[in-house]
A protein has these predicted regions:
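Extracytoplasmic metal-acquisition and chelation regions
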Residues: 11-295
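Hydrophobic membrane-insertion alpha-helices, especially the h-region
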Residues: 3-13
């Protein structure tokens, strides 16, 4: 595996919720097709690996979100991606440069796959401004749709091995559903809590889990809790595991969740957040409990 970075310019040559798909009794597998696939980040790479296993070649460009955001592509990058069979990207502002990069690619035999196809994207609510929320991959159904898009794109490029990719997709979905189901009862018990969010970053996750949320406005946290008639003992404040917060929350229940973690697959990221939330199912009422777990 080669991690593609800006150093490509040095001259390295490399280059709707979907249900379980229907399968047939007769399985055939041909190994005469070898696809070269490029993804933007490592979690997308992990999605592809669930479908192809070791059959094809897949590479990724970045791990860190900051590197993705600040990326400036070169002619060498354009040429390398253009020589791939598939280029897979999130399809949102998570990769702010993706639209212009795609415009400059030499399409030829290159397939360009938008993972957000079929996903109902949410927006940030910021005064009179509406901005797209790119973190759809933290949502359960949204992740399934994205994985389905990966599977469908690979099947389209390698139809002779359609059944092989179909089976791998079904296995991945069943495993994911089984892991989430383990926490189903604990998640239901969270209905007694009110989750205060500091922004919209975790909207996909909280909606997926039907959490009772309320977003902090410009009031001080103590005043906000009082105005909204909230029980401080039954309030949990969601804090970004990466960015944290400058607010003094030492007197309140908090939980650290992650909207993106480059070294963790999207399904593992969802499961991590679910596990952290589930810890509150048996938590005793206290006046000050702080959760500081990190990925």
């Amino acid at each position: 595996m080669v991690i593609i970075t800006i150093a490509l310019s040095l001259g390295m040559s490399l280059f709707s919720s979907p249900l379980l798909a229907n399968t047939e009794n007769n399985r055939t597998e041909s190994r005469d097709k070898y696809l070269n696939i490029m993804t933007v980040n490592k979690p997308q790479y992990d999605m592809v690996k669930k479908i192809i296993k070791d059959k094809c070649n897949v590479q990724y460009m970045f791990t860190n979100e900051k590197d993705i955001s600040e990326f400036k592509y070169s002619e060498s990058v354009l040429n390398n991606i253009s020589n791939m069979d598939l280029f897979i990207y999130s399809g949102t502002s998570f990769e702010p440069w993706s639209a212009s990069l795609i415009d400059e690619l030499k399409k030829g035999n290159l397939g360009i796959i938008n993972l957000a196809r079929g996903v109902r994207l949410l927006n940030y609510s910021n005064e009179n401004n509406t901005k797209e929320n790119p973190y759809y991959f933290e949502g359960i159904e949204e992740y399934k749709i994205a994985l389905y898009n990966v599977k469908a794109a690979i099947q389209d490029r390698d139809p002779q091995n359609r059944d092989y990719y179909e089976d791998n997709y079904n296995i991945a979905i069943k495993e994911f559903d089984k892991n989430i189901k383990l926490y189903e009862d604990k998640l239901k018990s969270l209905s007694e809590y009110r989750f205060i969010t500091l922004n919209n970053d975790f909207d996909y996750l909280t909606k997926s889990l039907n959490l009772n949320t309320i977003q902090l406005d410009n009031h001080e946290i103590a005043e906000f809790i009082k105005i909204n008639n909230l029980d401080p003992k039954k309030v949990i404040i969601i804090v970004d595991g990466e960015n944290g917060t400058k607010l003094d929350l030492s007197a309140y229940n908090t939980i650290k969740l992650w909207k993106y973690y480059g070294d963790m697959s999207f399904d593992d990221l969802i499961l991590y957040n679910v596990k952290e939330l589930s810890k509150w199912a048996k938590a005793k009422e206290t006046t000050s409990v702080t959760t500081t777990s990190e990925a």
